Amino acid sequence: YISPEIIDFGFEEKWAVIDLIMKQNNNNLPDRTIQYCSKKTPATYCRNVGRRRRWEFSLDKNSVDKEILNDDKIWNFLSKWITPEDATIERKTIYTFKSLIAKKWRKGRVFIAGDAAHLSPPFMGQGMCSGIRDVSNLFWKIAYCCNFGHKEKLLKTYESERLKNVKEYIITTINMGRLLNSIGDTNVSNTVKEEKDGSKKMTSIKPPL
């Protein structure tokens, strides 16, 4: 087996995820995904396929899951947007977002990728994307070694190339999540720096793919 040792970046949050089906089209709801940056209760609204809509909202780490998923509690939270007359609850669950990377991604003929190798908060939508990048990096290397007699050292580049990139994405995602959860706090806003022309600049993820 591969060593279970992990790097923990210390970010862990509970979020409720509520999927609903609208009984009829509600023109008052946004026709796009929106992130509500609130110090009290950060939330996300997703305009999904057809009449499906999703709300996600941050929970206190000491909250009781069973109580949070009570329908009355859910509708109370959603009351600023919709009521039970507008939609039915299709699914309700709680996710715990974590920030972890396995220290070893290979042992002999066994490799790990995706969620088996790393876990990221969802704020940049890069969890599954990173897993796809893992496989895209690895599959052709295995094929070259098995079918064309390439030296095994090629396989060693999988972990060295992917781990650094995933790490940078996770760190950036954590910072994004902290911003969403602290918006309006001067401790956060004062850290935003402007260019000389007054514009704000975001640099690319490093190291590159």
Set out the residue ranges of the language-model regions.
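Residue-level detector of alpha-helical recognition elements and their boundaries
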Residues: 21, 33, 60, 93, ...
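Hydrophobic transmembrane alpha-helix bundles
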Residues: 47-56, 88-92, 124-130, 186-199, ...
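Conserved FAD-binding catalytic core of PHBH/FMO-like flavoproteins
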Residues: 1-97
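Conserved mid-domain beta->alpha element of the FAD-binding
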Residues: 89, 95-175
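Surface-exposed loop/turn and secondary-structure junction residues enriched for glycine/proline
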Residues: 9, 23, 36-39, 48-49, ...
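Helical substrate-recognition/capping region of FAD-dependent monooxygenase/halogenase enzymes
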Residues: 76, 144-209
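Charge-rich, low-complexity amphipathic helices
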Residues: 20-24, 28, 40, 67, ...
